[in-house]
């Protein structure tokens, strides 16, 4: 629950951007649903793009807080596999699963140099670095390559859940991840 007007705007915008898309959601709709005045919005954000970046940053921070929390509580192999469990929970936890907020943003802002596309790409790069870090703690051979392969499984599960609707995508990806880890001697 939002504790201030800025957070209220970000939460409302995130919900609308996720369900309806970035370009399809106008500032007036965000203001109407958040109950925040236009002047307040522009006090906190110079533009819609700045609001989108704040939404992506908030989601990124929450995601990595959860990942790091798990990594601190679990051995590295279990923490790696817990990412797939978290993905399953995320896919099944929303009323209407609409894919990955970051992939959706990159799709709508497809220019690789656009700040929104770059922020989305940075999220994926940080996820890969997180996976690599856990693999390095396990002394995995070729940790960068294995991190990419695990990420492809995660991204594939996200995409297929968006296309097919929530199902067993994350659990199937977790099974494939276990095969990859076993093949790497982990």
Task: List each language-model region with its residue ranges.
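N-terminal intrinsically disordered/low-complexity leader segments
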Residues: 1-4, 185-186
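Generic hydrophobic, amphipathic alpha-helix propensity
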Residues: 5-13, 30, 55-59, 63, ...
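Helix-turn-helix
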Residues: 8, 12-50
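An amphipathic alpha-helix signature
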Residues: 10, 81, 125-128, 132, ...
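Hydrophobic/aromatic residues within well-ordered alpha-helical segments
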Residues: 48, 55, 59-63, 83, ...
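Hydrophobic alpha-helical connector segments
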Residues: 54, 68-97, 137, 147-150
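Amphipathic alpha-helical segments used for helix-helix packing
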Residues: 91-118
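Hydrophobic/aromatic-rich alpha-helical bundle segments in the mid-to-C-terminal region
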Residues: 113-122, 137-184
């Amino acid at each position: 629950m939002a504790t201030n007007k800025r957070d209220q705007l970000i939460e409302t915008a995130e919900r609308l951007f996720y369900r309806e898309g970035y370009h399809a959601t106008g500032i007036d709709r965000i203001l109407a649903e958040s109950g925040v005045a236009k002047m307040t919005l522009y006090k906190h954000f110079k533009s819609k793009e700045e609001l989108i970046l704040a939404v992506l940053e908030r989601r990124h921070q929450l995601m990595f807080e959860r990942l790091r929390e798990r990594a601190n509580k679990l051995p590295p192999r279990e923490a790696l596999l817990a990412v797939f469990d978290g993905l399953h929970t995320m896919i099944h936890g929303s009323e209407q699963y609409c894919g990955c907020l970051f992939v959706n943003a990159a799709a709508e802002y497809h220019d690789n140099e656009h700040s929104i596309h770059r922020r989305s790409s940075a999220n994926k790069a940080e996820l890969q670095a997180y996976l690599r870090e856990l693999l390095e703690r396990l002394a995995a051979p070729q940790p960068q390559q294995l991190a990419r392969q695990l990420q492809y499984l995660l991204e594939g599960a996200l995409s297929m859940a968006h296309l097919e609707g929530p199902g067993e995508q994350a659990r199937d990806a977790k099974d494939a991840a276990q095969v990859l880890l076993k093949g790497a001697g982990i």
